[in-house]
């Protein structure tokens, strides 16, 4: 009797686990969901080697273009080119952002605080903090995001 009971329990556990596995494997991966399952998010990634000449520039805003340099579910690196006077309008997102100023001069506003940054400088933006910039001298920013910005890939 005890053996029969253990077999029944084992069978119920197997059925329950099988049902759970099919639920998660059929679950739609929402890359914009900050709680995106690690396994799901890791399935999306760029090639290992990327050459600037092969990467397209995308219009982000007037006078602003971006080039996606590499990504996976947890990280994205984006090169952003600004013309003088271009504005990166104030916005916020759930992603952590760290940016390196590769060239040019920018007036950055982060959470209401304004600073001027030049080539060699950098800044950090915590999740859900309002930030934006004005380009004072044409330049390039190297943005890193965690997790990746699925919206930049057209995945919503």
What are these regions (language model features)?
Residues 1-24:
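Bacterial Sec-dependent N-terminal signal peptides
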Residues 34-74, 154-156:
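A short, N-terminal "cap"/entry segment at the start of jelly-roll beta-barrel domains
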Residues 94-106, 111:
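Glycine- and acidic-residue-biased ligand/ion/polar-headgroup-sensing regions
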Residues 102-103, 118-119, 137:
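A cytosolic small-molecule/anion-sensing beta-strand core signal
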Residues 113-127:
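Short acidic-glycine-tyrosine-enriched beta hairpin
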Residues 127-151:
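Ligand-binding loop in jelly-roll beta-barrel domains
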């Amino acid at each position: 009797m005890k053996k029969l009971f253990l077999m029944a329990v084992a069978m119920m556990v197997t059925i329950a686990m099988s049902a759970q596995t099919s639920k998660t494997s059929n679950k739609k991966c929402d890359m914009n969901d900050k709680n995106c399952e690690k396994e799901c998010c890791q399935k999306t990634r760029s090639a290992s080697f990327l050459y600037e000449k092969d990467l397209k520039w995308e219009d982000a805003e007037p006078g602003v273009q971006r080039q996606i340099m590499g990504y996976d579910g947890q990280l994205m690196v984006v090169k952003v080119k600004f013309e003088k006077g271009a504005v990166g309008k104030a916005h916020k997102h759930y992603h952590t952002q760290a940016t390196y100023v590769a060239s040019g001069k920018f007036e950055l506003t982060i959470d209401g605080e304004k600073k001027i940054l030049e080539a060699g400088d950098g800044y950090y933006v915590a999740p859900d903090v309002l930030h934006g910039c004005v380009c004072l001298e044409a330049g390039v920013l190297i943005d890193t995001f965690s997790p990746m910005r699925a919206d930049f890939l057209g995945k919503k």
